[in-house]
Swiss-Prot record:
Protein name (record): Protein OPG163
Nucleotidyltransferase recorded as keyword: no
Domain of life: Viruses
One GO biological process term: symbiont-mediated suppression of host antigen processing and presentation of peptide antigen via MHC class II
Keywords: Host endosome, Host-virus interaction, Inhibition of host adaptive immune response by virus, Inhibition of host MHC class II molecule presentation by virus, Viral immunoevasion
Organism: Monkeypox virus
GO CC terms, sorted: host cell endosome
Main localization of the protein described in the UniProt heading: host cell
Up-regulation conditions: Expressed in the early phase of the viral replicative cycle.
Family (UniProt): Belongs to the orthopoxvirus OPG163 family.
């Protein structure tokens, strides 16, 4: 696997094969160009973190997950450790409770939701709606379109105020 952005419930990360294995990431779905993944983790007591854990750990802050040796870590304003998680080969230290997604370096007020949230949409960014690879920006979508999108997708990305990014998972019968 080449480097890619993966959206997880803990935030967005750029992964390589090493990070993929360290965090035991499983790919769950795709929303257009975005990969939706899950990290297999178990919450641990912060007091159980050892010095040796810090040599190969990851930090989660403001919707982004980075390894401890990342240059991005210097830009994080980390004041406290909120919680910690153990993964397959490492730990993840969460430094805030913010679950906002940092997608492609643009800090946006978007969150990962089940596709049913499409019913709250007033604006939809739809990938793969009519044909594979297409993109559409739809203002005031019909209830019929929302229903079909909710059935075809498992997840959507939402700002919680009506802006939804979703994948139509097009096939030859979609919207016919």
């Amino acid at each position: 696997m080449d480097a890619a952005f993966v959206i997880t419930p803990m935030g967005v990360l750029t992964i390589t094969d090493t990070l993929y294995d360290d965090l035991d990431i499983s790919i769950m779905d795709f929303i257009g160009p975005y990969i939706i993944g899950n990290i297999k983790i178990v919450q641990i007591d912060v007091r159980d973190i050892k010095y040796s854990d810090m040599q190969k750990c990851y930090f989660s802050y403001k919707g982004k997950i980075v390894p401890q040796d990342s240059n991005d870590l210097a830009r994080f304003n980390i004041y406290s450790i909120c919680t910690a998680y153990r993964s397959k080969n490492t730990i993840i230290i969460a430094c805030d409770y913010d679950i906002m997604l940092d997608i492609e370096g643009k800090h946006q007020p978007f969150y990962l939701f089940p596709s049913i949230d499409v019913f709250n949409a007033t604006i939809i960014e739809a990938y793969n709606l009519y044909t594979a690879g297409d993109y559409h920006l739809i203002i005031n979508p019909s209830d019929n379109l929302k229903m079909k999108l909710s059935f075809n997708s498992s997840f959507c990305i939402s700002d919680g105020n009506g802006w939804i990014i979703i994948d139509g998972k097009c096939n030859s019968n979609f919207l016919s």
